[in-house]
C-alpha cells in the first residue's frame, strides 16, 4: 500500500492549536473543529469546507462552553428521527488548567441552519481529560483519561444516558486494559469499541483491546505483523469497514512521530499490521494531539504540535495500491435537502463516484474531487465560504438543458425544418412542468408559455443559494445565463454568458413524464430522462418522438446520475464556452480579495511573531541577569572557599598544638618553615654582616696585669716624645669613642628595625655565638693574666725605684680609663639587653608579620615543591614500569627456571611478583635474582 500526501492551501485558516476535536459532518461536506490549546485555550467553532478549501467560524446561540482542550466530541442522531436533517455533537470533559472539567455540552445542529448550545445539568463526577468516547444505543460510553489535579489515571468505563441525563459506572469483565490517557478509540460494526496505545504517566503503550458493547467484556487483540511503536497523542481513523489508520503521536523516547500504520481487520479474530510507504514531497511533519477525518475517500490531517512547533496546516492522504491505482475511490456526496449543506443526515446522500461497498455512508469528496469534472479548477481560488451540495449543480445542468431544448424546439417549429434532428437530453425537476400541444398551430403559444415559465423559474431559483457557485469558484469562472430567451442557442452565443446563474425547467406533454417526476421527486433522487429525437412539424412526428422518448427512458433508467451529467456537459461543450468568456474584472477582484486576506493573515502572523520575539527577548534579558547573579554568587563562594582554605593553612601554620595533626601535614609544615627560614636568612645576611662589623669596631679591653692590687698594662715604657704622641692618640681615641656611642645608637635603631624581621631560631643562634665568644674571651684573659703574673714576678726584681713613681701614675691613669671603658661596656650591655627585650617583642612566633606577597611566595614554593615531588614520583613509577616491561620482554620467551634452566617456573615472589624460579631453586634464595629485592612471601602456581 502507498499513500499520496498533499498539503492543502487554506483560505482564512484559524489559529494553530493542539488538543482539539474534529467531527466529520454527516453529509460529507467537511468537518467541525472545537476547542484546542496554543498560548491560550479556545472555545470557538470552526468549519472546514472540503469543496472550496475554506474555513469559516460558526456563531452558535446560547452559552458556549468554557475554553478547553483534551475533551471528547461525538456525533449523535436520535433513532426516533432517523430521516431528520438535525443532529447533535456531544462534548465531554477536557481541561484548561490542572483541574479537568466534568460537564457535558451539546451542540444542536437543526435543519434550519441554526446552531444552539445547551449545557446538561447532571450529578457531578470526577472530571477527566485525554479520554475517549463513543455512542452506543443512546448512551455515551467514556473510557480512560487522567486527572492531573489528583495525579490519577483511569481505566474505568462510564455511561451517560442521553435520555435520562444520568451517569453510571459500567462493570466490565475479561482482560481489562491498564489505566491510560491520550489513547485512541474506534468502533467496528457499531458494537465493538477498540482502543490503541496511550500513556499512564510512566509508560507508553502499543497494545490493542476491544470492548464488546453488548456483553461488556474486554478482550486483548493479538495482531500479526510489526506493530507500531508505543505512543500517545496519536489519531485512529476507520478508512474502510475493515481498515484502520494510525498516524503520528509521541513515542516512548519522547520523539514525535509521523509514520502511518494500517490495521487490517480480516475476520472476527484475525488482525494484521501493515506500514505503507509515502509518495510525494509534502509529507506531514511529526506531531501529536492532532485530528484526522475521513471524508470522500481522503483522510484530512489538521493541526497538532511537535518538536516545539505549533501547527495549523492541513494535509490530505489518498490510498493507492502497488500499481498506483486508488484503493479507496474518491466519491461525490450529493445531499438532497435544500437546506444548508452543513446540515444533513447520513442517509440522505447519494454516492456519485465509483461504487465502494467498504466506504462509509457519510463519506464525500465534493465535485472538485472527481477527476473528470472541472479538472482545471484550483483549490486555492475558491473564495466562497458556504458549503455547496452537488444537487444544485445537477439542477442547473438540467435547467440549462431544458432551456436549450425549448429554444431549439421553438426555432424548428417556426421554420418548419423537418431535417433538423436534435439529440438533446430532457431532464426534469420537481418544481414546475409544462405541456406542449401536438398541433402545429399552437407552437407560438407554447413558446410563449415556455418563456414565461422560464422567467418564473429564474425568479424562484434566485431566492435560493447559487446552484452554479462551484463553477463560479473555479479558475475558468464558468457561469450560465438563460434570461435572454430570444437567443437562438447557448452554444452559439458564448457572449451572453455572465456571472449570474439561473435555471429553467421544461418538459414535453406526456403522462409518463408527470408520473416519473412525482415518483422521483418523492424519493429525492435525480431521475434519468430520455433524449429528444425527431421533428416537431406535425402530430405524427410528435407521437413518434414521444414513443421513442418512452423507450429510451426505459433503457437509460439504470444509468447513474453522474453519467447523465457528464454526457450533458459533453453535448453542451460547456468547458469551451466557459473558457471563451472569462470575466477579468471579477477574477481580479477575487484575486485582490484573496491577496488582501492573505496579507491580513500574514500581518496578524507577523504581529504575533513580533510579540513572541519581544517576550523571548525579555526572557533572554531576565536569563542573562540571572546568569550574571549566579556567576557573581559563584565567584563569592569560590572566594569564600579560598579564604577558608587560607585560614585553615594559616591556623595550621601558627598552631602550637600539632599533636592532633597527621604526619603528612606536619611534614608539609616543616618543609614550609625550612624554606621560609632559608629565604629569610638570605634576606638578613647584610644585617648580620653589619653586626659583625660593629662588634669589630668596638675596642677590645687592653690586657692588664694585676700586681699588689693594681692593674698594669702590659706595655714597654716609652720615651717622652713617644709618650706625648701616645697621649695625643689617646685623646683622639677618646673623642672618637665619645662619637662612637651616638653612631652606635643610630646604627642600633636601624638594626632594631632590621632585626625585628629575624626569626626566633636565628636570634637564639646569634645569642649562643655571642655567649661562646664571651667565654672564649674570658678564658683568654685569664690565661694572659696568669702569664703576666709570672712575667711580673720574674721581672719585678729588675725594676728600679725611679721608675716606680712613673708606673704608679701611669697605672692610675690607665685604671681610670679602664673604669670609664668598663662603664661604657656596662652601658653597652644594658643597651644590648634593652635591644634584646625589644627583639623578644618582635620575635617571629609564626608568619603573622609576613605580608601578602611573602605568603604568596611561600605558597607558590609549597606548590612547586609538591609538583617536584609528584614529578619525581611519576619519574620513579615510569622507570619502574620501564624496568618491568624490560623484564617482561626478557621473560616472555622463557619457559624454564632462571637458575637451573631445567625446571619450569612455578613460584611467584612477593612483593616483586617475579615468576621466573622453580620451587627447588626458590627454597635456597633470600633475594630475587632479577630485582635483588628481599623475598617476603612465595606463591606456588599449579599448571
From Swiss-Prot:
GO terms for molecular function: zinc ion binding. Residues 369-527, 536-553 have a biased composition (Low complexity). It comes from the Eukaryota. Its main location: cytoplasm. Residues 354-558 are annotated as: Disordered. The keyword Repeat applies. This is RING finger protein B. The lineage of its organism: Eukaryota, Amoebozoa, Evosea, Eumycetozoa, Dictyostelia.
Amino acid at each position: 500500500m502507498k499513500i499520496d500526501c498533499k498539503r492543502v492551501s487554506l483560505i482564512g485558516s484559524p489559529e494553530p492549536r493542539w488538543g482539539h476535536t474534529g467531527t466529520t459532518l454527516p453529509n460529507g461536506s467537511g468537518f467541525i473543529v472545537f476547542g484546542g490549546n496554543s498560548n491560550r485555550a479556545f472555545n470557538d467553532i470552526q468549519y472546514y469546507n472540503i469543496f472550496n478549501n475554506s474555513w469559516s467560524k460558526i456563531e452558535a446561540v446560547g452559552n458556549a462552553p468554557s475554553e478547553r482542550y483534551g475533551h471528547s466530541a461525538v456525533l449523535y442522531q436520535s433513532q426516533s428521527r432517523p430521516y431528520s436533517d438535525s443532529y447533535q455533537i456531544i462534548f465531554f470533559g477536557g481541561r484548561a488548567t490542572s483541574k479537568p472539567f466534568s460537564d457535558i455540552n451539546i451542540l444542536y445542529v437543526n435543519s434550519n441552519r441554526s446552531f444552539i448550545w445547551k449545557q446538561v445539568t447532571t450529578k457531578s463526577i470526577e472530571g477527566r481529560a485525554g479520554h475517549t468516547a463513543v455512542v452506543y444505543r443512546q448512551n455515551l460510553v467514556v473510557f480512560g483519561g487522567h486527572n492531573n489535579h489528583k495525579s490519577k489515571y483511569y481505566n474505568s468505563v462510564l455511561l451517560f444516558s442521553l435520555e435520562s441525563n444520568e451517569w453510571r459506572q459500567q462493570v466490565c469483565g475479561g482482560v481489562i486494559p491498564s489505566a491510560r490517557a491520550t489513547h485512541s478509540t474506534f468502533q467496528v460494526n457499531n458494537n465493538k469499541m477498540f482502543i490503541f496505545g496511550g500513556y499512564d504517566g510512566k509508560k507508553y503503550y502499543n497494545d490493542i483491546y476491544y470492548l464488546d458493547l453488548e456483553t461488556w467484556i474486554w478482550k486483548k487483540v493479538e495482531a500479526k505483523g510489526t506493530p507500531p511503536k508505543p505512543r500517545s497523542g496519536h489519531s485512529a481513523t476507520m478508512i474502510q469497514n475493515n481498515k484502520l489508520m494510525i498516524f503520528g503521536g509521541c513515542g516512548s523516547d519522547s520523539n514525535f512521530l509521523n509514520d502511518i500504520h494500517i490495521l487490517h481487520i480480516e475476520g472476527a479474530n484475525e488482525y494484521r499490521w501493515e506500514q505503507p510507504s509515502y509518495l510525494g514531497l509534502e509529507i506531514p511533519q511529526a506531531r501529536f494531539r492532532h485530528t484526522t477525518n475521513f471524508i470522500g475517500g481522503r483522510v484530512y490531517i489538521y493541526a497538532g504540535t511537535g518538536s516545539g512547533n505549533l501547527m495549523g496546516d492541513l494535509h490530505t492522504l489518498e490510498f493507492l495500491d502497488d500499481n498506483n491505482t486508488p484503493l479507496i475511490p474518491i466519491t461525490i456526496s450529493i445531499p438532497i435537502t435544500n437546506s444548508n449543506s452543513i446540515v444533513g443526515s447520513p442517509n440522505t446522500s447519494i454516492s456519485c463516484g465509483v461504487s465502494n461497498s467498504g466506504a462509509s455512508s457519510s463519506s464525500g469528496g465534493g465535485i472538485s474531487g472527481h477527476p473528470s469534472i472541472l479538472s482545471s479548477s484550483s483549490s486555492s481560488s475558491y473564495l466562497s465560504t458556504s458549503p455547496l451540495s452537488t444537487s444544485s449543480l445537477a439542477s442547473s445542468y438540467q435547467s440549462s438543458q431544458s432551456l436549450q431544448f425549448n429554444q431549439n424546439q421553438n426555432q424548428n417549429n417556426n421554420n418548419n425544418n423537418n431535417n433538423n434532428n436534435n439529440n438533446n437530453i430532457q431532464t426534469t425537476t420537481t418544481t414546475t412542468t409544462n405541456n406542449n400541444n401536438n398541433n402545429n398551430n399552437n407552437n407560438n403559444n407554447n413558446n410563449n408559455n415556455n418563456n414565461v415559465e422560464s422567467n418564473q423559474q429564474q425568479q424562484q431559483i434566485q431566492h435560493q443559494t447559487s446552484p452554479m457557485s462551484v463553477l463560479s469558484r473555479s479558475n475558468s469562472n464558468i457561469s450560465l445565463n438563460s434570461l435572454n430567451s430570444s437567443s437562438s442557442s447557448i452554444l452559439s452565443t458564448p457572449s451572453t454568458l455572465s456571472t449570474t446563474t439561473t435555471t429553467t425547467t421544461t418538459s414535453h406533454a406526456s403522462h409518463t413524464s408527470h408520473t416519473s417526476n412525482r415518483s422521483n421527486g418523492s424519493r429525492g433522487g435525480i431521475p434519468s430522462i430520455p433524449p429528444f429525437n425527431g421533428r416537431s412539424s406535425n402530430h405524427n412526428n410528435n407521437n413518434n418522438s414521444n414513443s421513442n422518448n418512452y423507450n429510451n427512458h426505459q433503457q437509460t433508467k439504470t444509468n447513474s446520475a453522474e453519467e447523465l451529467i457528464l454526457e450533458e456537459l459533453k453535448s453542451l461543450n460547456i468547458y469551451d464556452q466557459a473558457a471563451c468568456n472569462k470575466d477579468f474584472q471579477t477574477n481580479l477582484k477575487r484575486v485582490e480579495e484573496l491577496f488582501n486576506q492573505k496579507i491580513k493573515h500574514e500581518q496578524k502572523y507577523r504581529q504575533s511573531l513580533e510579540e513572541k520575539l519581544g517576550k523571548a527577548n525579555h526572557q533572554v534579558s531576565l536569563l542573562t541577569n540571572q546568569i550574571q547573579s549566579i556567576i557573581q554568587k559563584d565567584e563569592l563562594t569560590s572566594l569564600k572557599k579560598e579564604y577558608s582554605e587560607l585560614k585553615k593553612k594559616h591556623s595550621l601554620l601558627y598552631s602550637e598544638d600539632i599533636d592532633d595533626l597527621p604526619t603528612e601535614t606536619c611534614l608539609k609544615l616543616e618543609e614550609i618553615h625550612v624554606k621560609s627560614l632559608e629565604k629569610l636568612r638570605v634576606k638578613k645576611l647584610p644585617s648580620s654582616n653589619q653586626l659583625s662589623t660593629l662588634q669589630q669596631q668596638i675596642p677590645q679591653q687592653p690586657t692588664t696585669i694585676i700586681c699588689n692590687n693594681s692593674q698594669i698594662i702590659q706595655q714597654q715604657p716609652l720615651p717622652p716624645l713617644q709618650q706625648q704622641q701616645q697621649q695625643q692618640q689617646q685623646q683622639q681615641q677618646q673623642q672618637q669613642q665619645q662619637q662612637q656611642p651616638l653612631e652606635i645608637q643610630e646604627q642600633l635603631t636601624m638594626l632594631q628595625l632590621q632585626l625585628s624581621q629575624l626569626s626566633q631560631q636565628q636570634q637564639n643562634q646569634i645569642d649562643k655565638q655571642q655567649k661562646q665568644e664571651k667565654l672564649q674571651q674570658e678564658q683568654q684573659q685569664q690565661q694572659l693574666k696568669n702569664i703576666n703574673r709570672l712575667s711580673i714576678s720574674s721581672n719585678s726584681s729588675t725594676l728600679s725605684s725611679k721608675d716606680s713613681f712613673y708606673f704608679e701614675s701611669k697605672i692610675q691613669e690607665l685604671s681610670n680609663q679602664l673604669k670609664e671603658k668598663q662603664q661604657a661596656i656596662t652601658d653597652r650591655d644594658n643597651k644590648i639587653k634593652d635591644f634584646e627585650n625589644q627583639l623578644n617583642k618582635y620575635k617571629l612566633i609564626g608568619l603573622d608579620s609576613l605580608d601578602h606577597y611573602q605568603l604568596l611566595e611561600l605558597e607558590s614554593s609549597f606548590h612547586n615543591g609538591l609538583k617536584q615531588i609528584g614529578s619525581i614520583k611519576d619519574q620513579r613509577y615510569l622507570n619502574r614500569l620501564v624496568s618491568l616491561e624490560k623484564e617482561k620482554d626478557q621473560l616472555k620467551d622463557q619457559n624454564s627456571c632462571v637458575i637451573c634452566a631445567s625446571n619450569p617456573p612455578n613460584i611467584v615472589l612477593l612483593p616483586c611478583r617475579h615468576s621466573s624460579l622453580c620451587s627447588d631453586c626458590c627454597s635456597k634464595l633470600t633475594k630475587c635474582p632479577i630485582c635483588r629485592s628481599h623475598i617476603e612471601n612465595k606463591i606456588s602456581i599449579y599448571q
